[in-house]
Amino acid sequence: MDPHSLTLTAAAEGAHLRAAASAAADGLFDDLPEPRAVVLITNESRARLAAEAVIALAADARAPITIARSLPRFVGALDLVFVLTDDPGDPIAEVLAEADRRGAATVLVDPGEGPVRAAASSRTVVVPRPAMSAVGSFCGYVGAVLGALTAARVTALGPAAVLDDVADAVDAEAVACAPDRDLLVNPARQWAEWMRGHSVVVAGEGDVWRTVAELAAAWLLDAGLPAHGTTVSDMLRASGALAPSPAAALDDLFHDPLIDGPVDGGRMLPLSVIAVTSPADAPAVRARLEPFEWARVECPAEEVEVRHPLVDVCVTAARVAAAAAYVPEEG
């Protein structure tokens, strides 16, 4: 994905959340029944990460929530099925139609005009996508699913007022990371500057933050940066192998690893580790990573007054997306 497209996609995260908040406030989800089980159907990696984040965040869920690529055999009239896709021509349209035929309540995050939307029945709740948005968003999927699940009394995590507050926080993050703000005052540019020219491991502890770490790695790969998402525990377990070798640490001003090859058999690109976390967990994560000068902790939600798990996750996701957009810039 080119830098301009990355920038536009990152800037739209708040708008996607706002669409979910408006849908909840306008009563779009009010007729959803309390389900026996919830199934999140998706074939896409970003949407799947959003689905995994929903499951991890909704610790108070009153019904089991599962993720699937196809419709499970058990799904029937007592269940609630979500379809999450960016592709309006996705074959997942057949799943949506089959869920409706079985009598399940269905929710579609609108991918735009095409077979998927056409497969929605009059009973399907269709969550609108912001105007001029070509793709879905991690934050938008999380907000839409949690807004619907809150209305269906599965969780209390995502009422309309909370989603609106989260959208405000994400919009404020987008302003702070806007292209007209330079390196001195732009936290996303500062993050990108630190990562540029490195292979990056993004780590997050626990199921929620592992999904954010994997999302960050996906954004960075879109920007052309080698990246991997994992847990803090797994990163620490591998720290001996990840640490720069003494030979690689020797600073040869005339050595270019992209032209001359790795130093003494070292890596083609130096390694950086970034841990993403919540304000509550940041002190502990910083303490664990303090011995490693090639690692840093990023906690964008520390700068936000509103304290809520959705704020922590969505503001971090917004900064990750903005930072990825700036990686291709010249240092």
Feature map (PLM): residue ranges:
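A generic structural motif
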Residues: 65-71, 109-111, 225-238, 294-307
